[in-house]
């Protein structure tokens, strides 16, 4: 027993010498006991969908982390990202949209609630330029959310300047790998939410297993703290007319909460995510609103027969809608975002 104690004492002395040397070279706090590290709750930006906020387990898109939103074309990826930007701006945050696809529609963004007059946009010519711009903005510490749309459009400069049909094997994957190694630490230090929008492609000749993959290599999958898969389920109709589409978002990777949670919500053409519909559906699933047959009720008050009637009633009674949303957040364990506590304020 005495020998064990003596060995432990010698180890601690050796550790103290090593820590002292490290501190001189790299500064105080380079290595420290875990108990000395202050635990800071991760700040988040709401997604515009309360069901998706719940599915993420932390209340939205995490700041100081990298998030990938991927899916097939026209599934609602950019719409979701624009809602995140709108929510950040409502809370005093600064947002940047790096439009590598050169396809952002300011009129559509405005309809989703984005303050286009205060949205910063970049339309880079090639992939390296886009990622260097993102790095500079992140290092400034002044930006709350950066959206890169999309990874598939981050074409390396060599490929753009090369001949048509010339083989450019793995250049984009190497570009993403090099960039993400630099961006990961910078994102954490600046507390910026970095969102990459990505597409789904199919591998050629895959007979077994999932043939679907995303461009840009494996680096983004590895460095992302959260990955959201967006799927379009079907059309939303009203009186036989198509008004929008139903979306399912699956959290396929989550380093902050249990993964594989799912959320479904409606996206209305020209309006974006139907917030009231989402609140009604989520409240009904959690028992905040009761559904008897086709009737929706909140407490003793009948809201209407069918979701459209309930939606109409809550539009006319916004104070009740606010109360229902608050109860949904309480029941689900989410803290209601306080618009007075700006996400634009950087943590010390």
From Swiss-Prot:
The keyword DNA-binding applies. InterPro entries: AAA+_ATPase (IPR003593), DNA_recomb/repair_RecA (IPR013765), DNA_recomb/repair_RecA_CS (IPR020584), P-loop_NTPase (IPR027417), RecA-like_C (IPR049261), RecA-like_N (IPR049428), RecA_ATP-bd (IPR020588), RecA_C_sf (IPR023400). The keyword Phosphoprotein does not apply. Keywords: ATP-binding, Cytoplasm, DNA damage, DNA recombination, DNA repair, DNA-binding, Nucleotide-binding, SOS response. Coiled coil: none annotated. GO terms for biological process: DNA recombination; DNA repair; SOS response. ATP binds at residues 71-78. It is found in: Cytoplasm. Its main location: cytoplasm. It holds the Pfam family RecA_C. CDD domains: RecA. Gene3D superfamilies: P-loop containing nucleotide triphosphate hydrolases (3.40.50.300). GO terms for cellular component: cytosol. GO terms for molecular function: ATP binding; ATP hydrolysis activity; ATP-dependent DNA damage sensor activity; damaged DNA binding; single-stranded DNA binding. Belongs to the RecA family. Can catalyze the hydrolysis of ATP in the presence of single-stranded DNA, the ATP-dependent uptake of single-stranded DNA by duplex DNA, and the ATP-dependent hybridization of homologous single-stranded DNAs. It interacts with LexA causing its activation and leading to its autocatalytic cleavage. This is Protein RecA. It comes from Aquifex pyrophilus. The lineage of its organism: Bacteria, Pseudomonadati, Aquificota, Aquificia, Aquificales.
């Amino acid at each position: 027993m005495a020998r064990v104690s003596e060995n432990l004492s010698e180890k601690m002395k050796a550790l103290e010498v090593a820590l002292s040397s490290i501190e001189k070279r790299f500064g105080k706090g380079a290595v420290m006991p875990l108990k000395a590290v202050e635990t800071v709750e991760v700040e988040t930006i709401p997604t515009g969908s309360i069901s998706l906020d719940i599915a993420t387990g932390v209340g939205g898109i995490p700041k100081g982390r990298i998030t990938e939103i991927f899916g097939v074309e026209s599934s609602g990826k950019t719409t979701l990202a624009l809602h995140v930007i709108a929510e950040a701006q409502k809370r005093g945050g600064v947002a940047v949209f790096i439009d590598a696809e050169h396809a952002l529609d300011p009129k559509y963004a405005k309809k989703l609630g984005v303050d286009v007059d205060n949205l910063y946009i970049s339309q880079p010519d090639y992939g390296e330029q886009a990622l260097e711009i993102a790095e500079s903005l992140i290092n400034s510490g002044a930006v709350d959310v950066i959206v890169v749309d999309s990874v598939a459009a981050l074409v390396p400069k060599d490929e753009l300047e090369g001949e048509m049909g010339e083989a450019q094997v793995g250049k984009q994957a190497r570009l993403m790998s090099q960039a993400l190694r630099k961006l990961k630490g910078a994102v954490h230090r600046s507390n910026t939410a970095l969102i990459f929008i990505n597409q789904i492609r199919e591998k050629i000749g895959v007979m077994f297993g999932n043939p679907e993959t995303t461009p840009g290599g494996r680096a983004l999958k590895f460095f992302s703290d959260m990955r959201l898969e967006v799927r379009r389920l079907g059309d939303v109709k009203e009186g036989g007319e198509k008004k929008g589409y139903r979306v399912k978002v699956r959290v396929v990777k989550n380093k902050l909460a249990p993964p594989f949670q799912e959320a479904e919500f409606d996206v209305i053409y020209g309006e974006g995510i139907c917030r009231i519909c989402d609140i009604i559906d989520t409240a009904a699933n959690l028992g905040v609103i009761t559904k008897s047959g086709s009737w929706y009720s909140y407490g003793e008050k009948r809201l209407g027969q069918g979701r459209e009637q309930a939606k109409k009633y809550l539009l006319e009674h916004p104070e009740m809608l606010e109360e229902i949303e608050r109860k949904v957040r309480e029941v689900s364990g989410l803290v209601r975002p306080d618009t007075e506590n700006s996400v634009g304020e950087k943590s010390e």
